[in-house]
Amino acid sequence: MAGKTLYDKLWDAHEVKRRDDGSSLIYIDRHIIHEVTSPQAFEGLRLASRKPWRIDTNIATPDHNVPTTPERKGGIEAIVDQVSRLQVQTLDENCDEYGIVEFKMNDERQGIVHVISPEQGATLPGMTVVCGDSHTSTHGAFGALAHGIGTSEVEHVLATQCLVAKKMKNMLVRVEGELPAGVTAKDIVLAVIGKIGTAGGNGHAMEFAGSAIRELSMEGRMTICNMSIEAGARVGLVAVDDTTVNYVEGRPYAPKGEQWKQAVASWKGLVSDADAVFDTLVELDAAQIKPQVSWGTSPEMVLAVDQCVPDPAAEADLIKRGSIERALKYMGLSANQAITDIKLDRVFIGSCTNSRIEDLRAAAEIAKGRKVAANVKQALVVPGSGLVKAQAEREGLDKIFLEAGFEWREPGCSMCLAMNPDRLESGEHCASTSNRNFEGRQGAGGRTHLVSPAMAAAAAVTGHFIDVRELIQGSAA
């Protein structure tokens, strides 16, 4: 009998009942809640005269709609947009009514859901984790089975602590070798998406493995698992090792004392067996990965920074040719245009993909001693949580950014999506550390280019895309 994958082990440990239709009832350990997908779920509970089944498994924070400017210090009443204000207020009221732990807008622990749960130790190895947000795959970096759910499922988890789901296939993405200097976790996952496409992981749980993955910090692993959904996989996973355990130890929600020792002992088994069989295998050589830049309107439209935008005339497939033509038109780019010739109007460093302390350090290293280019109208740095912000300020990173001409903001989802005041104007090009470059994602008509934090900072100070390794080596100014 073949061994089990990590996904198999997590699934089996949480399968309550297998149903006749092939689906299963799965127990949920951690439910993370934000202001956008929860109001209808709570209202559904009331209409059915139900209450949350287990209060202690829920943790909440507002993130999508909160302003990142000083206006938030005035409280909910200071939020200008009426819908945003109502959603944040409703989350507060629902959590207060049911006694759910919430890090409210001006709590230092507030932040993006996929940043605050890991930093609190609320995401633990071996858990099932769900949230009404597709980037819940982030938490798979801890060897947890994590994925996004819809609003009706949010209500179902609140009411029953279970979900009905069908088991997925197993995919292994193996990245071996040593990453070149200046190449990051973001570049790995963009390269993976560029290789297999946004549908490549459909129907799969995607486990990332190999020497290059093992060398990543937890921040890097979270970045990679965060974007597994952009490769079509609802679930991204990394096996548990000492890096995982060391990150979790001592955090507020982490086990303590004898329970900690028992937990660590059980977590050590959260790896795929040596003889486990995967349905799909994808392999990359880390040494061959270069800094990546998305050029089009899908994350799979991505290239190394030293390449040129594709020419639709060179594409034999008529459907793909049409897709390239539409993307070029929307993005305002020309066939065969060098990536390094793309000029930027705005830069955004933040989001649940890249707003942790390691990300801010990488960007600050590039920004230090330099100035935001004259053609860049705005360069935003938005920490993923109040605790990340405080840590960055203790390290003086805020001063580096401010002296370089960046704006230093309060935590939130910010310009990742046009649901708050931080957004692009039509026709503007933005170097963004977020995860999606769909049409209108950052604002109607906005043109998004996905990059790593270091690449975003490099674009900010040069005004166009540049191989960040040139700045690291000091050969460009």
Curated annotation (Swiss-Prot):
Pathway as given in its UniProt record: Amino-acid biosynthesis; L-leucine biosynthesis; L-leucine from 3-methyl-2-oxobutanoate: step 2/4
Top-rank taxon: Bacteria
Residues at which [4Fe-4S] cluster binds: C352, C413, C416
NCBIfam families xref list: leuC, PRK05478.1, PRK12466.1
PANTHER family per UniProt: 3-ISOPROPYLMALATE DEHYDRATASE, HOMOACONITASE, MITOCHONDRIAL-RELATED
Complex formation: Heterodimer of LeuC and LeuD.
Name assigned to this protein: 3-isopropylmalate dehydratase large subunit
Originating organism: Pseudomonas entomophila (strain L48)
Name of the gene this protein is made from: leuC
